Amino acid sequence: MNAAVKALHENDYLVADLSLAAWGRKEIRIAETEMPGLMAIREEFAAKQPLKGARVTGSLHMTIQTAVLVETLQALGAQVRWASCNIFSTQDHAAAALAVQGTPVFAYKGETLADYWDYTHRIFEFGAAGTDGEGPNMILDDGGDATLLMHLGKRAEKDLSLLDNPKSEEETCLYAAIRAKLAVDPTWYSRKGAQIIGVTEETTTGVHRLKEMSAAGTLLFRAINVNDSVTKSKFDNLYGCRESLVDGIKRATDVMIAGKVACVAGYGDVGKGSAQALRALSAQVWVTEIDPINALQAAMEGYKVVTMEYAADKADIFVTTTGNRDVIRHEHMAAMKDQAIVCNIGHFDNEIDVASLEGYEWDEIKPQVDHIIFPDGKKIILLAKGRLVNLGCATGHPSFVMSSSFANQTIAQIELFCHPDGYDVGKVYVLPKHLDEKVARLHLKKVGAMLTELTDDQAAYIGVPKNGPYKPDTYRY
């Protein structure tokens, strides 16, 4: 090993504090007992090494549960480089536990945006410093930032003017990072992108980006939409948020939720779980919706369906769950009660118009908890600066539900890497139903569930295979 390569491997990580590694390892061991899907996949595939030769760039919240995912990919033969997909979501002891084992991980809680985009670049560098080296051949993404970086960077190689007019602080930092990279290596993005077989995407927002690029004919590689696996969206998005939302609010504020009016913006899977959690603690839950079907669902569940304009001066707690921008705008916050709590559990920070508050006085109560003081002296409490409250102010979803999501991710990585000819470049796929059902089966024993088996006559009568899949793709669950 030459000196340059040796130096790269010896320093190929950036975490907050390596002394936290032992603590992180203890929590990883506990999480493994709660993640039967990933552990079963290790047992099934470790000897076969289906990911041998895979170089996986991972951009996903660097939590204890993610550490179990990373080590599952490695157990199946993959090389992995990892960064968080959110500046506040890293658990520093989890990152340290991976780093001391030799995993190149670049993440700390409370990153600057400049650091965030620097680290997102670093996870594409599998080769020795100072050489072209190898890039990844797989991306595991959450929110689509790693995928976006490759696509925007490649386009900017031909037209730097694409970077001339950033519309947010996030874009300002992203565009600056791309300009800096192109200044020293004008073909870096196209070289790295050319090696990528495909991407597996974790969340609704990232899938939306992929579908837009696919429809426009600009998606550079194959993609599997993990989010729309039933055992992801109907479990992680619903049951995960049902537990982690109130965990974040409680840790941040110690507020009594019972008796409060809580306004949940959006009634998709995340909104449903959030509304259930708040109602379980005896809040009066109101819902805002644009979709008449979702609005009717909320009403039939007993929630009051209102507009944000109606709720703004009446509710005590506001939660955005939509994946859209400007859901809570300045005029809404200006109308809110003194000490209203405002937070977001959608992927990006633009659901709440935080930028409109920058000219006001901010008083940090503690990390990720701020009083925003309006000119009339009124204060609202903003959590995680409008980013994911469950990861910014708490530790995210429980291990068990993340086992289901991450089992889908691992299976999707195996599918794309081992069978790329079955997937067209530029198209977005979901995993087939039998694999979705497999993920569910892997988790039944842990919760003590007993599965009824069809008889031959029953299977013939309803026209399904005895061992599944049991439902058509159109079934909504």
UniProtKB/Swiss-Prot annotation:
Pfam families: AdoHcyase, AdoHcyase_NAD. The keyword Lyase does not apply. Keywords: Cytoplasm, Hydrolase, NAD, One-carbon metabolism. SMART domains: AdoHcyase, AdoHcyase_NAD. GO terms for cellular component: cytosol. Its EC number is 3.13.2.1. GO terms for biological process: L-homocysteine biosynthetic process; one-carbon metabolic process; S-adenosylmethionine cycle. It is found in: Cytoplasm. NAD(+) binds at residues 203-205, 237, 266-271, 289, 324, 345-347, 390. Pathway: Amino-acid biosynthesis; L-homocysteine biosynthesis; L-homocysteine from S-adenosyl-L-homocysteine: step 1/1. CDD domains: SAHH. Substrate binds at T63, D142, E202, K232, D236. It is an enzyme of class 3 (hydrolase). It catalyses: S-adenosyl-L-homocysteine + H2O = L-homocysteine + adenosine. Binds 1 NAD(+) per subunit. SUPFAM superfamilies: Formate/glycerate dehydrogenase catalytic domain-like (SSF52283), NAD(P)-binding Rossmann-fold domains (SSF51735). NCBIfam families: ahcY, PRK05476.2-3. May play a key role in the regulation of the intracellular concentration of adenosylhomocysteine. This is Adenosylhomocysteinase. It comes from Leptothrix cholodnii (strain ATCC 51168 / LMG 8142 / SP-6). The gene is ahcY.
